[in-house]
């Protein structure tokens, strides 16, 4: 089983995102509309698994498949849709086999893009909710140190509730 470790907030995470996003953007070329930093490392002052999550919006999702070899040269494994229709998913491990990056690619403006960005922006704008999320992640990592599936399942209800609030707030603005 994969070990679950959450780390204290790291001021390097945004810089790590910027550096990697620049390389991914070069690979995607003129197909890329925008690359966003998502996931817990994109939310200030919370504990996170030290994995940089990126969400790339593209103008043509089918053109992404032609980039698989270039992404592999950058160290990524292409996993196709990986359970989410319309997505292209890549992950990257370091030399020790530890996960360092995820790249989720969707058609620009898709519902998945809107959902991910709404959650991130809601958590950034609501530090109390972000702190609750951080505390939950730490508790789950302590409870399930060797069970990533139980850790993820434990976050699910909270994340869905926050996504719902985020989408409701977005609809009102």
Name each model feature, range by range:
Residues 1, 45-49, 114:
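Short, flexible turn/loop "capping" segments at secondary-structure junctions
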Residues 1-36, 160:
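Helical scaffold of the NTase/Pol beta-like nucleotidyltransferase catalytic core
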Residues 36-37, 101-104, 116, 151:
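Histidine-centered active-site/metal-ligand motif
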Residues 23-65:
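Active-site nucleotide-donor binding segment shared across nucleotidyl transfer reactions
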Residues 109-173:
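Catalytic cores of NTP-dependent nucleotidyl/adenyl transfer enzymes across multiple folds
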Residues 5-11, 56, 119-123:
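Short histidine-centered catalytic/ligand-binding loop motif
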Residues 76-111:
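Conserved catalytic core of two-metal-ion nucleotidyltransferases
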Residues 66-74:
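Short amphipathic alpha-helices in soluble, non-transmembrane regions
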């Amino acid at each position: 089983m994969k070990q679950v470790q959450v780390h204290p907030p790291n001021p390097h995470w945004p810089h790590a995102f910027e550096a990697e996003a620049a390389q991914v953007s070069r690979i995607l070329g003129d197909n890329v509309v925008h690359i966003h930093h998502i996931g817990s490392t994109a939310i200030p002052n919370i504990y996170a698994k030290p994995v940089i999550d990126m969400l790339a919006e593209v103008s043509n999702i089918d053109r992404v498949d032609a980039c698989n070899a270039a992404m592999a040269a950058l160290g990524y494994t292409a996993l196709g849709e990986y359970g989410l229709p319309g997505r292209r998913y890549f992950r990257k491990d370091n030399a020790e086999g530890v996960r360092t990056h995820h790249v989720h690619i969707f058609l620009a403006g898709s519902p998945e893009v809107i959902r991910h960005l709404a959650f991130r922006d809601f958590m950034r704008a609501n530090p109390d909710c972000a702190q609750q999320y951080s505390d939950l992640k730490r508790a789950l990592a302590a409870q399930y140190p060797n069970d990533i599936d139980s850790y993820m399942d434990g976050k699910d209800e909270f994340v869905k509730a926050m996504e719902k609030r985020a989408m409701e707030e977005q609809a009102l603005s």
